[in-house]
């Protein structure tokens, strides 16, 4: 649960920093001294980031799709089932995450018999929706 709180805090911080930087209309100071960090760090522009929270009922899933700038999924509740084209199905539990590289065709959703709440972080760009995931594909056959 602690890991979920940390991941949720990170996602919310990214969304908040996107808003604050955009509202200020000022680029962050490169390499500014900050007593909370050791070494040079830079707050990067997050204007294209988006964070969404979605609930999937047991067995619900997306169609095959890709994101032209990638996607990060975080499991808040339940279990997530995902598959990247040409790879085996993978399941993740609470506090675990999965990154999908740009333009990689994949699907994700809840496992059979258990609901899922996921956070998805988008990096801008577009989603290309493809065909539905069949029951056989969902079951790994």
Give short role names for the model-derived ranges.
Residues 2-53, 63, 91, 128-141:
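A short, N-terminal "cap"/entry segment at the start of jelly-roll beta-barrel domains
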Residues 56, 86-103:
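Short acidic-glycine-tyrosine-enriched beta hairpin
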Residues 68-86:
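Glycine- and acidic-residue-biased ligand/ion/polar-headgroup-sensing regions
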Residues 46-48, 58-74:
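A short beta-loop-beta micro-motif enriched in histidine and acidic residues
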Residues 102-128:
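Ligand-binding loop in jelly-roll beta-barrel domains
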Residues 62-67, 84, 91, 109-110:
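Short histidine-centered beta-strand/loop micro-motifs
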